[in-house]
Amino acid sequence: MTSTLFFSLEKKNWIAYWNRALVFLFITTYFLGGITRYKHLIVILMTITTIVYLCKRPKHYLSLFKTCLFGSVAILTIAALLSLLQSPDAGASMKEIFKAIIENTLLCTIAIPVILRDEKREDVEKIVFFSFISALGLRCFSELIAYYKDYQQGVMPFADYRHRSISDSMVFLFPALLNLWLIKSAKYRISFAVLSVIFIFLILGTLSRGAWLSVLVIGLIWILMFKQWKLLLVG
């Protein structure tokens, strides 16, 4: 009896770690370039895991498909597939549809909720939050390496627009950086300070006024929502 319970708990823990690792890796690597092969591997593993879970306990996950979000994404996917009938290059169109809708939007709508179905709400929030923070950290690290390589070739920062491509991902990940400030712990405040300095340098290096304005507006809205006046004074 005891041994059966032990192995049952071990199996549940293994499954929980597997689920969390898949979601963490998917979010963390999403904004990185040059690792497409590994991204596809993660997507394949998530898809297989989702199919296995749905086949084993279909009723357990049925409520996830009774939402307006899933219905909207399903309609979008069907409409995109029907558009192939009018496309002059069905192969190229299918490739873009698979990448933009099926692999990203549909996967996020189905796979992530299914994989994290048995997790507590607090645990899901932590997984998603630290995944975005890790994604921001890796994005900043990879971009600093790019700046270092440019410097070795005699290209100084803010010299041209070659780093503008990171604007969208930096703006998208900015709220995660702001929420790091809400964790009242010395090590997290230090992490916030270090990441903030790097973030400011990189976002200025994009030379994108649209990105600057977006970060400013997001920051002001966040400060007003959470009433973090000290952060406003520091800024």
Where are these regions (language model features)?
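Aromatic-anchored transmembrane helix interface
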Residues: C68-L76, A90-I115, K126-F129, L136, ...
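Alpha-helical transmembrane segments of multi-pass inner-membrane proteins
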Residues: D123-Y151, Y161-G235
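Hydrophobic cores of alpha-helical transmembrane segments in multi-pass inner/ER membrane proteins
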Residues: L45-T50, N104-P113, D168-L180
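Transmembrane signal-anchor hairpin modules in multi-pass inner-membrane enzymes, especially those
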Residues: M1-A92, L116-K126, F130, W181-I190, ...
